[in-house]
Amino acid sequence: MKYDVVVVGSGVAGPTVARDVAKAGFSVLLVDKKAAIGTPKQCAEGITIEVFKEFDIPYDKRFINREIYGAKIYSPSGYTAELRYKHVSGVILERKVFDKMLAYYAAKAGAEVLARTEVVDVIRRNGKIVGVRAKHEGEPLEIEAKVIVAADGVESTIARKAGINTYAPPHEFDSGYEYEMLIEGYDPDLIHLFFGNEVAPRGYVWIFPKDEDRANVGIGIASDHPQTAKYYLDKWLKENNIPMRKILEVNVGLVPVGGFVKELVKDNVLVVGDAARQVNPVHGGGMKEAMKAASIAAKWIIKALEEENLELLKNYSEEWWRTEGPRMEKLLKLRKAMEKLTDEDLDVFVQLVSGTDLEKLAGGNYLEVVKALMKHPKVLMSRRRLEILKALL
């Protein structure tokens, strides 16, 4: 089997690359180790509304569970800050359907798609990578390709086999645990985020509504914490008198939140999405970031193939670090500052921020918010709070 491009992994990043490159007329094979693309989900399933237009994805109600109008955050002592729009700001997806449809769009664009195909190694000849070795339904398979895209998730095999350093210590990952369950008493038009060092150490509890009385209820905490994410989620549910007898699905996963892979290209191998740790460090979401990286990667793959010059692939890494890197580094800086906050700090800051401030913080445009907070008496009276905020300037 020979192709111009083989894409390993059919989550969000992989099909985006495959679709765009196939549209340009090149032969593409998209493979995924799962028997059913999109399962199991490892995601809270929330995404901003802008993604559909930006990445040319149909707004298809088949994979949209619920439209969302904003967010509400809760401090340890119960103080709240709310951001509510008059228009739809995001949606809660059905990832099992969404991921499969992204693969479908890639196939419609001309890519070939193979599920239940696990890539286990790269093929080297004369010191160069010329393809990948895989197992398709247990049978060995060799796939030759001019370009290889590692979109195979946080534990990327291909990036590592190609010699790209994707290592990160356990502390740089969050452990996620989530129930899809029946739940009442929370506005289903908003996502809800609960903070506190006893609630979710270094993370938060989320409620992402999928229906009037059904939601993804999950938690992310430091993966090296002595207690498990499940322990803290069950504890929170019990403390809030939320029954645990109507759980429809359980999902677990690791989220890379501590930094990004520096070398995104090595020779003819590109790494994108979770495999490159291209995840928003503040909230742990990675779908939009994955599609953005995939779009940049696809652009340079097309140019490299058109000009028969694989050296052009390096421009993907350069462009991502130039256009996305500064914002992502600022968000990482913000996350590290947030990790130092006590419950009292969280109470103070949630009381002081507005809904608009929340939007700016989540997007990395936080300088004016920080400057305003630094003038407030509750911050000025605390040298430690001032130092935490100053570190963000």
From Swiss-Prot:
Pathway where this protein functions: Membrane lipid metabolism; glycerophospholipid metabolism
Co-factor binding comment: Binds 1 FAD per subunit.
Enzyme class label: oxidoreductase
GO annotation terms (biological process): glycerophospholipid biosynthetic process; membrane lipid biosynthetic process
Cofactor field: FAD
InterPro entries documented for this protein: DGGGPL_reductase, FAD/NAD-bd_sf, Geranylgeranyl_Rdtase_fam, Geranylgeranyl_reductase, GGR_cat
Family: Belongs to the geranylgeranyl reductase family. DGGGPL reductase subfamily.
Additional notes on this entry: Reduction reaction proceeds via syn addition of hydrogen for double bonds.
Protein name according to UniProt: Digeranylgeranylglycerophospholipid reductase
Source organism of this protein record: Pyrococcus abyssi (strain GE5 / Orsay)
Lineage start: Archaea, Methanobacteriati, Methanobacteriota, Thermococci, Thermococcales
